[in-house]
């Protein structure tokens, strides 16, 4: 029996208050309006950015359905939708691609102006929500809200992918893998034979290492205070691993000493101000590039001596690995299907969706790289 055009009642993980567990609730998901798509979720990853929203490090209006790294199947479409149809396998895009704004038309940038990241409204483009719980509207999260059996997204925020793709793996292309991999190959533009340092060895950090390796880096130094993460870092391409706690001097001085004055490319994949500076200082003062990948705490500032850049360093950042989402996600899935990279090393835990709080406990304890929730 078709559900198209009807309200769907389903389970979703609702965050009612900051720093509280998710509550599995029955929610009502309204049909998609014009240029919107309703998706039946199949798998969603738990990303550190979701936890940043739980703690308030990323500001979000409450109550909210979080989740942004996922894959599913189109259940129904609103009027005027042309890029997907019911039954298509898709990945929602937290960085949309409208194709019309100044940024979408820019050859190098991808941060579409129609995003809900900077000052989130928690609504779809028409300013309203498709979620209701206990008679109250529930906010969307960066246009995706994948911690729900069904979600509604704007057409500019969804990409059709290969019908044969395993959704419980390629969901990582919706955020973590692409963010890390693209930071190396597209944002930093790592060169063959170069030296790299990667701060933070979670799922995104490991994806940065995979990107550095794919780009031909000859030396990849992995940095983390959790040495349990070192074997996996080496498995995906790190040539050496160092723990800042093993040294009396600052880690940037250690890296400068072992890399002839600094690496060619450094990446901060944690989201801490002290490591952002350490990563910047770890790249060579005259020719190094440092990329901010991790999401830093909202409304915190940094004091940096401009002389650090005057000598020739480059300091940059990007959302979603610099990839134009609607164009790039299908290609990344095709590359995965062609075995150009593996996502298996990133997936450490698979849990049923109802165990979402357990999945977040694994993330916070450092015991998982990526936990996938299946519906």
Curated annotation (Swiss-Prot):
The reaction(s) annotated as catalysed by this protein in its Swiss-Prot or TrEMBL entry are: a primary alcohol + NAD(+) = an aldehyde + NADH + H(+); a secondary alcohol + NAD(+) = a ketone + NADH + H(+)
Could you give the cofactor binding note from the entry?
Answer: Binds 2 Zn(2+) ions per subunit.
Please report a single Pfam family linked to this protein.
Answer: ADH_zinc_N
Which SUPFAM superfamilies does the record associate with it? GroES-like, NAD(P)-binding Rossmann-fold domains
What are the UniProt keywords, alphabetically?
Acetylation, Cytoplasm, Metal-binding, NAD, Oxidoreductase, Zinc
Residues reported in the UniProt entry to bind Zn(2+) 2: 98, 101, 104, 112
Q: Which domain of life is it from?
A: Eukaryota
Report the GO molecular function annotations. all-trans-retinol dehydrogenase (NAD+) activity; zinc ion binding
**E.C. number, please?**
1.1.1.1
- GO terms classed as biological process: retinoic acid metabolic process; retinol metabolic process
Positions of NAD(+) binding:
200-205, 224, 229, 293-295, 370
The record, for SMART domains, names: PKS_ER
Q: Which family does it belong to?
A: Belongs to the zinc-containing alcohol dehydrogenase family.
Name used for this protein in its record: Alcohol dehydrogenase 1
The uppermost taxa in this organism's lineage are: Eukaryota, Metazoa, Chordata, Craniata, Vertebrata
